[in-house]
């Protein structure tokens, strides 16, 4: 059964399944009628988010080479166990159009199941990517079926599934990642910073400045130079990027990913601030490309320089050859209350 259901912000496609224990195997097959809503470039893995707090990553495959049948594998049994599914319950899956299915359960009386306490399953984040031709019959090389989400992502899921009592659709984030610990620690350890800070940089030398002594600095710098050279060949800088803005009159700048990934900072060039006479309130909304799922990320402006930006880079699975553009929503007096993030795939 498939239905184009109504989401909070937009119409998103849904499909429904009846859970029958005797007929349910190791995998979950999607209705063929739902194929028209799947992206042309199929993800190797998809995220299933339960409204009750659990998060799973499952493999997404063609069923035994059949181009019209798709299944979720390597994780469906875990979902059944974690949610304690009962025979005859209705399962609703809402697809965001790219890689995420929001999941809820209706009892036999067609009432949505609620849970008093939220349970968060922390999973591991690797093996992302796209594959059009990999079939269900192929051997799955990774023994890990789950992903690890950082504190920002888990906070987003919780806030998305809880009733919003504020007048604005704003999600307050947890503390930003600690730059001095490794990626695994970033994902699973409690953050020690006191607040989420946006830092507006007053340094224009964004592309070439090196920071600190790093054993891998030369390698990283050389790799980043290669990415920049390729972008220049494609003519992907300057006013050419204005075509990606929602409002072509807004100020914008292209993010230096080398700095964002390594130093977890969003740096706004002084020349942009000066040229347009920009200034900022105490709090600013950072609008993620996945806004329909996560809402606006509310962050505090402190001093002259925005921190904790790496979570958006991770959440959107941004690669070095992708382009990240920040569009500044400017009011008549130059006040910027919102920054829209656009991810352009390379």
From Swiss-Prot:
Residues 158-179, 192-243 are annotated as: Disordered. Residues 192-217 have a biased composition (Acidic residues). InterPro entries: B3_DNA-bd, DNA-bd_pseudobarrel_sf, Plant_B3_domain. It is found in: Nucleus. It holds the Pfam family B3. The keyword Cytoplasm does not apply. It comes from the Eukaryota. Residues 218-229 have a biased composition (Basic and acidic residues). One of its GO terms (cellular component) is nucleus. GO terms for molecular function: DNA binding. Residues 13-109 bind DNA. Keywords: DNA-binding, Nucleus, Transcription, Transcription regulation. This is B3 domain-containing protein At5g60142. It comes from Arabidopsis thaliana.
